[in-house]
From Swiss-Prot:
Disulfide partners: none
Keyword annotations: Nucleus, Ribonucleoprotein, Ribosome biogenesis
Name of this protein: Ribosome assembly protein 3
Subcellular location: Nucleus, Nucleolus
Description of how the protein assembles with itself and partners: Associates with nucleolar pre-ribosomal particles.
The keyword Zinc is assigned to this record: no
Pfam family, one: Rsa3
Gene Ontology CC annotation, any one: nucleolus
Region called Disordered, residue ranges: 1-35
Recorded name of the encoding gene: rsa3
Biased composition (Polar residues): 11-26
Family that this chain belongs to: Belongs to the RSA3 family.
KW Repeat (keyword) present: no
One BP term from GO: cytosolic large ribosomal subunit assembly
Amino acid sequence: MATNDQKIDNKSTVSNMLENPMFQTFSKKETEKPSLSEYMEQLTSEFGEELDNLRQKEIFDHNKLQLLIESLRAGHKIYE
């Protein structure tokens, strides 16, 4: 079991690592919330084939397709 001194040393080590430029891999732009259009564009480019397959299935009428679109848009809210 770690002692309090070891826990403090571990926290210091983590803090030092986070301050090291080698560990700062995300730029400010990468950590900013994407716009809805950027989010939807990325989503459709990554999962375009799957979404197109779903769209073409007979079980998807207009209402269900709209529900799918709104559900995908709702995923954008995780960035708030």
